[in-house]
């Protein structure tokens, strides 16, 4: 298992540096590879679902193979370097698979606009992080959308990559990020991608199955630290997670909504928790994420030390 020092370094690098420029960001390179392959294996828009599934699966397989092989060799080369240089470089590269700082930046913007009384600015800001039409959302639903995005991405942006890095090093983290990117680019249930992106979407569900539930449990454990209600958090985890169409996102969304005693609602799709959402409670959600990450690292460090 990966030395916890590397995980701490990855978090520190991400929180200080944030996202790298697009020209040198590995996730952007992965996206370009996916787009290149998609241009070769074009979708037929469901006119031939078997062809779409085959070529979409090839796109997925080739992407994961290329990313995994490169990450494997980079991993081995780094570990040939002397300590502490190897740990520093390893931690830096691992940080590129994490979106901790950028997640906070994007999700806080709408809340800050609401705090300053600028509803229109908040709508525009939240539109960057959700797919629903935000142009007519009221204050509560803007706040809800921001916290939904934050809670949903605890797994995708932070815990998931760390989880796979622990067991599989850089290859695990980068393959996980590639799966997320594939799902984000071709994992849609529309005419073009229904069959072409089916494998990518299923792999994303599988990859997030364990990390999402770990994140949900950690939100329960850390609830007292962010003024959350433990009993309600447990209720959300056990009883409301399945209200969300995603098989994984609900475990963090429902747990956090109930812990903070707020309502997270995507009109016409789901309604989680109860109680009125406001700026203060919305900002508490960021504390919840911080405590979740810290406790995750502490627990893993103890396990690593004992074993």
From Swiss-Prot:
Q: Name one GO cellular component term.
A: plasma membrane
In what pathway does it function?
Cofactor biosynthesis; adenosylcobalamin biosynthesis
Q: Topology versus the membrane, per the UniProt entry?
A: Multi-pass membrane protein
Q: Where are the membrane-spanning stretches? A: 53-73, 78-98, 156-176, 206-226, 286-306
Which Gene Ontology biological process is one annotated for this entry?
cobalamin biosynthetic process
A Pfam family reported for this protein in Swiss-Prot or TrEMBL: CobD_Cbib
Q: Where is the signal peptide?
A: none
Keyword Cell membrane annotated: yes
Q: Cross-referenced InterPro entries, in alphabetical order?
A: Cobalamin_biosynth_CobD/CbiB (IPR004485)
Q: What does this protein do?
A: Converts cobyric acid to cobinamide by the addition of aminopropanol on the F carboxylic group.
Q: Which family does it belong to?
A: Belongs to the CobD/CbiB family.
* Protein name per Swiss-Prot or TrEMBL: Probable cobalamin biosynthesis protein CobD
Species of origin: Methanocaldococcus jannaschii (strain ATCC 43067 / DSM 2661 / JAL-1 / JCM 10045 / NBRC 100440)
Q: Which gene encodes it?
A: cobD
